[in-house]
């Protein structure tokens, strides 16, 4: 009996020593192993990414000229919502328009807008305020509110400079104080505009402009003429666009090229805002959502797939126009507002 107990204890000791030896021989985890495990755990699944990217367009970021896509970190940075351009970059859906602002007003309003949350600023050579826009952006950067890559800046080459487009584009960048301009547009059709568009395409290759487009071109024929002038498809067409002129036919046509319609005068423009703000349909929908008429109109714009750039020198209005990301219009409301389109343009540019 004693001998049996002795053998049993001996066997148990052998098993215990074997287990300890096996545990000691296992390779310890290196810091790299630990980091790899943490990385695999922290990366969201594809399904999670799709759920969290609801503000982003599903359009692939393939540049229209066939070159490599823009850096991914540049493409997903606008918390207020953005759209994918066919250039491979992303563009915020709401911005500040600066038409009629002086340099001093532009500096003040751009700074305030960026502080409020805007990440898209629209200017033009014709406005005469590129220096002010640049100063406002620089103040925001110097104050640590944003980095340069956080803000999308648009300018436009004016007809008077169509004879020397390369120098004109460089001069805009200089006045803005920028190494590159996010989007450069031809301001309107005119003599030599096809050559100007070729210069814009060249500016993309030079790296001084990232995306290009056209402004105040309202028909598919006009678009095709400009598109065929160079090897880069326009990323944006910026036109008059509001309740009573919604560019629906052009917008539908441009979809095949992943070209986005951007709206100047999205609230109707000077002398016409009151009529649109007092529209019975807009007033009723605004009361339902506890929002103002301009907020309903701007919400409709971005929810329809447009980019809107309302302009103002009033800080309260700038802040009000930005406050449109905490609600959505229903499908029925969207259809009601769509039905308000009368095909009426207020300007003849």
Ranges and model annotations:
Residues 1-6:
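Positively charged n-region of N-terminal signal peptides that target proteins for export
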Residues 147-161, 182-189, 216, 241:
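A short, structured active-site edge motif that brings together acidic residues
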Residues 56, 61-149, 267-268:
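N-terminal binding-site loop/beta-alpha segment at the start of enzyme catalytic domains
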Residues 17-19:
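C-terminal motif of bacterial Sec signal peptides marking the signal peptidase cleavage site
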Residues 29-68, 76:
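Post-signal peptide N-terminal segment of mature Sec-exported envelope proteins
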């Amino acid at each position: 009996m004693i001998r049996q107990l002795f053998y049993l204890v001996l066997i148990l000791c052998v098993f215990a020593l074997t287990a300890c030896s096996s545990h000691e021989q296992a390779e310890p985890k290196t810091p790299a192993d630990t980091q790899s495990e943490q990385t695999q755990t922290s990366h969201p699944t594809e399904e999670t990414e799709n759920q969290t990217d609801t503000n982003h367009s599903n359009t692939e970021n393939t540049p229209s000229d066939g070159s490599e896509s823009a850096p991914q970190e540049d493409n997903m940075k606008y918390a207020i919502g953005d759209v994918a351009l066919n250039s491979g970059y992303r563009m915020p859906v709401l911005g500040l328009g600066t038409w009629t602002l002086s340099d001093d007003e532009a500096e003040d309003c751009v700074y305030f807008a960026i502080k409020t949350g805007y990440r898209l600023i629209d200017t033009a050579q014709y406005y005469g305020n590129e220096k002010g826009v640049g100063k406002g952006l620089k103040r925001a950067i110097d104050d640590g509110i944003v980095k340069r890559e956080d803000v999308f800046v648009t300018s436009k080459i004016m007809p008077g400079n169509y004879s020397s487009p390369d120098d004109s584009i460089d001069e805009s960048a200089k006045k803005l104080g920028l190494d590159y301009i996010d989007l450069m547009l031809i301001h309107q059709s005119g003599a030599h505009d096809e050559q100007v568009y070729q210069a814009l395409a060249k500016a993309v290759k030079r790296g001084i402009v990232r995306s290009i487009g056209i402004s105040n071109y309202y028909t598919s024929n006009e678009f095709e003429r400009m598109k065929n002038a160079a090897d880069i498809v326009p990323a944006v067409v910026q036109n008059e666009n509001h309740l009573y002129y919604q560019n629906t036919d052009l917008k539908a046509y441009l979809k095949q090229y992943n070209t986005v319609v951007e709206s100047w005068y999205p609230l109707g423009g000077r002398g016409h805002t009151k009529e649109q703000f007092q529209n019975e349909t807009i007033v009723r929908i605004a009361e339902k959502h506890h929002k103002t008429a301009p907020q309903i109109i701007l919400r409709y714009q971005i929810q329809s797939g447009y980019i809107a750039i309302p302009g103002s020198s009033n800080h309260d209005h700038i802040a009000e126009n930005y406050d449109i990301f905490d609600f959505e219009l229903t499908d029925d409301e969207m259809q009601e507002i769509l039905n308000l389109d009368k095909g009426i343009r207020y300007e003849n540019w």
